[in-house]
Amino acid sequence: MHLSAGFLSCRERKGDFSCLTAARICEASTSDAVVQAAGTAMPVPLAPYPTPPVPFTPPNGAQSQLVCSGCRNLLMYPAGATSVCCAVCSTVTAVPAPGTEMAQLVCGGCHTLLMYIRGATSVQCSCCHTVNLAMEANQVAHVNCGNCRMLLMYQYGARSVKCAVCNFVTSVGASPGTDQKPSS
């Protein structure tokens, strides 16, 4: 295989190569190859590359989201994780304890989306350090309809929510199947 000027050429003895660069990097599946640069032959030990690990996904595929504490990107992670490493800035963000209800607000100073533990009275933005008041009256929560599984949004503090699709009344915080009935 010959490449344009400034690049190395690569000759295969046994095995198959997948790429070649000016930095004298060859990927191959065998250990017997020669790289030629400026007419000189140089043996290159080659090792098979390991297969990248498959990300762990729980059997039911459950995933949650949180905001990176470093760059404020939205991160998705599998249920059960205790911390998440951001692929953009490599910051490790702790996952809130299971059952911790989270809320969101937009920072009044820099308009960054902030996530915080529900019930907090104020939230300080990590970007601009503005202290934002968390108003209880405007907070909403989410629950899946107990009948059709539609994601429903309701005002925090409500005891139940009625689905606009199937008219099913879902009790908030109750286990599925308890005190839930279709509304007429």
Curated annotation (Swiss-Prot):
It holds the Pfam family zf-LSD1. Residues 104-134 are annotated as: Putative zinc finger 2. Its main location: nucleus. It is found in: Nucleus. InterPro entries: LSD1-like, Multihaem_cyt_sf, Znf_LSD1. Keywords: Apoptosis, Differentiation, Hypersensitive response, Nucleus, Plant defense. Residues 142-172 are annotated as: Putative zinc finger 3. Induction: By light. Down-regulated by dark. It comes from the Eukaryota. Negative regulator of programmed cell death and hypersensitive response (HR). Positive regulator of callus differentiation. One of its GO terms (biological process) is negative regulation of defense response. One of its GO terms (cellular component) is nucleus. Residues 65-95 are annotated as: Putative zinc finger 1. Plants silencing LSD1 display a lesion-mimic phenotype, increased pathogen induction of PR1, enhanced resistance to virulent rice blast fungus and accelerated and intensified hypersensitive response to avirulent pathogens. Plants overexpressing LSD1 show increased content of chlorophyll b and enhanced resistance to virulent rice blast fungus. Callus overexpressing LSD1 shows accelerated differentiation and plant regeneration. It comes from Oryza sativa subsp. japonica (Rice). This is Protein LSD1. NCBIfam families: LSD1. PANTHER family: PROTEIN LSD1.
